[in-house]
Amino acid sequence: MATLTRQDLNFGQVVADILCEFLEVAIHLILYVRDIYPSGIFQKRQKYNVPVQMSCHPQLNQYIQDTLHCVKPLIEKNEAEKVVVVIMNKEHHPVERFVFEISQPPLLAISSETLLSHVEQLLRAMILKISVCDAVLDSNPPGCTFTVLVHTREAATRNMEKVQVIKDFPWIVADEQEVHMEEAKLIPLKTMTSDILKMQLYVEEKTQKSS
């Protein structure tokens, strides 16, 4: 059975394509499950052979797509450590942080037949876990909003500045209150391990959400 290495195929690009497609679905599902937007703006779709809820709101969808478009070059170069969906209350204080911790093996040689099928199974399991995360999380206060943060390796700063010049969607340094949350508990949701990608998903939830 033939094997593929990084020299034969741009695995960074493959991983970035797979991961950004997954993150788009995951972000939509988080917003639906956690009641950040009215359920009426979501439609049921099929992804990874499971039903998911996807937004039909053009501006919201564009924001998510633009964000992931800027994240993608960082994933390709293995410079993104975490992608975080931050849920904030009316005072813009975080009440939940969905953290996708990403790592890629530096070297690999895998069979082409198993490149995608195994990863899709793992991503399906992660989507299913997100869809039922309400069971382990407390309700959020009304009027919550969200933002997406990216934690990068130090060497990625210059690359982010280049992307900022190209895209009309500038990177800004996150506010300290968005990055750190006091009195939070950590709730592990799912871990996946494959030949091309390792990812851990957990939630940091504020103990007292009511202000």
UniProtKB/Swiss-Prot annotation:
Keyword terms, alphabetized: Cell cycle, Cell division, Cytoplasm, Cytoskeleton, DNA damage, Mitosis, Nucleus, Transcription, Transcription regulation
Main location: nucleus
Family annotation (Pfam families): HORMA
An annotated GO cellular component: nucleus
Organism: Danio rerio (Zebrafish)
Top-rank taxon, per record: Eukaryota
The gene coding this protein: mad2l2
Function: Adapter protein able to interact with different proteins and involved in different biological processes. Mediates the interaction between the error-prone DNA polymerase zeta catalytic subunit rev3l and the inserter polymerase rev1, thereby mediating the second polymerase switching in translesion DNA synthesis. Translesion DNA synthesis releases the replication blockade of replicative polymerases, stalled in presence of DNA lesions. May also play a role in signal transduction in response to DNA damage.
Protein name as it appears in the record: Mitotic spindle assembly checkpoint protein MAD2B
Gene Ontology terms describing biological process: cell division; DNA damage response, signal transduction resulting in transcription; negative regulation of protein catabolic process; negative regulation of ubiquitin protein ligase activity; positive regulation of DNA-templated transcription; positive regulation of peptidyl-serine phosphorylation
UniProt domain HORMA: residue ranges: 13-203
Protein's UniProt keywords contain Repressor: no
Quaternary structure and partners: Homooligomer. Interacts with rev1. Interacts with rev3l. Interacts with fzr1 (in complex with the anaphase promoting complex APC). May interact with cdc20.
Compartments it resides in: Nucleus; Cytoplasm, Cytoskeleton, Spindle; Cytoplasm
